[in-house]
């Protein structure tokens, strides 16, 4: 059934956003043809990426700060005009708050169906911590944009309940789970520079923001003298990891890799022994998150060590997929708790068959009804 074309908006460079890729695949399977719109990080980057549907990336003169977000809004407004005129779009899908206003504007102006997917609790994100004026502006922006929608998606029940209580919207939950697929063939450790006969802990994430646990993982190596740590991704903590490792004298056991395409990431994940998810509860967006890396580890068949947070910690305990590290506040205490959790996991961790059974219950296809149901007429 051909439903027409739908503009899908995102503020990143398209290449590494797995949730958006999966959303577009679901829309495509249901008869929609997505037209994916993102941005180019650098002027020399290609305007398109390799996908089985139309896509283009807009160039913005600013990369961060208020001027970036202002230029993004008008860049997306112009892009939606192109989606309507050149591609014949009749619906729009906004991903996160920074793309919602252009989508609401288009849906009201042209009578398009609209969908909104909040990938995080945007106004409680790390980047707004200690910035009350900037946070107040985003809250005002959110209230204004939310007038144009009556329902939305988000990533877990705690964030969904917060939006329901605040705005009275219908909020459906679609967690950041992988698509159902055959188990990935582990990447040869020799190719990655990992040791063959040592325990390798992995922390992966497209962007490692402050307090996402990368530096805590590095510090834990001081308590795990025979273990290695691999970091895959980008971001401030990713960049600082080697400096911390050198101060502790553990740099020989740290392996840092840039972010990589999803299929390559799956193979690297399958080559590790333990997956780490170590967010600190510094902001509500972290405190109530259910990171997609937990599900990536699960589908790769490796157990996890997770920080003691309300949503992620409960999931790990209830599903029996790893060990929750004891809560602590000081850097040294956190690292020690991680080390103790890793040792506990290696002594008495979940069996591979159990991980496979849990993974079978948590996959993207199980949420297709909620995803397609997010499209609605504008208010």
Where are these regions (language model features)?
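Membrane-proximal helix-turn-helix segments that form the acceptor-binding/catalytic region
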Residues: 77-81, 101, 105-109, 116, ...
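Donor nucleotide-sugar binding/catalytic pocket of nucleotide-sugar-dependent glycosyltransferases
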Residues: 38, 123, 139-185, 194, ...
């Amino acid at each position: 059934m051909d439903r027409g074309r739908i503009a899908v908006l995102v503020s990143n460079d398209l290449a590494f956003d797995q949730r958006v890729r999966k959303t577009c695949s679901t829309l495509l399977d249901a008869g929609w043809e997505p037209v994916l719109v993102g941005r180019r990080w650098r002027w020399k980057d290609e305007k398109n990426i390799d996908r089985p549907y139309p896509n283009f990336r807009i160039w913005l003169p600013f990369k961060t700060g208020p001027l970036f977000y202002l230029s993004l809004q008008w860049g997306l407004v112009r892009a939606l005009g192109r989606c309507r005129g050149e591609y014949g779009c009749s619906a729009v899908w906004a991903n996160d708050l920074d793309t919602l206003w252009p989508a609401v504007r288009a849906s009201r102006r042209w009578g398009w169906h609209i969908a909104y997917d909040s990938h995080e609790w945007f106004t409680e994100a790390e980047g707004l911590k200690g910035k009350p004026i900037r946070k107040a502006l985003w809250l005002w922006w959110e209230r204004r944009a939310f007038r144009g929608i009556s329902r939305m998606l988000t990533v877990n029940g705690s964030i969904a309940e917060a939006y329901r209580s605040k705005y009275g919207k219908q909020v459906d939950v679609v967690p950041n789970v992988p698509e159902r697929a055959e188990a990935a063939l582990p990447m040869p450790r020799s190719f990655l520079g990992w040791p063959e006969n040592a325990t390798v802990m992995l922390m992966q994430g497209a962007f490692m923001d402050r307090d996402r646990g990368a530096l805590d993982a590095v510090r834990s190596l001081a308590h795990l003298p025979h273990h290695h740590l691999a970091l895959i991704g980008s971001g401030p903590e990713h960049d600082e990891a080697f400096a911390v490792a050198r101060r502790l004298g553990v740099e020989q056991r740290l392996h840092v890799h840039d972010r990589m395409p999803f299929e390559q990431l799956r193979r690297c994940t399958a080559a590790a022994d333990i997956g780490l998810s170590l967010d600190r509860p510094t902001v509500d967006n972290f405190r109530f998150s259910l990171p997609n890396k937990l599900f990536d580890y699960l589908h790769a068949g490796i157990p996890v060590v997770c920080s003691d947070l309300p949503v992620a910690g409960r999931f790990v305990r209830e599903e029996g997929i790893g060990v929750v590290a004891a809560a602590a506040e000081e850097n040294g205490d956190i690292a020690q708790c991680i080390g103790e959790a890793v040792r506990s996991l290696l002594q008495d961790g979940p069996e591979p068959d159990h991980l496979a059974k849990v993974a079978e219950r948590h996959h993207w296809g199980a949420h297709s009804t909620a995803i397609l149901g997010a499209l609605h007429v504008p208010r």
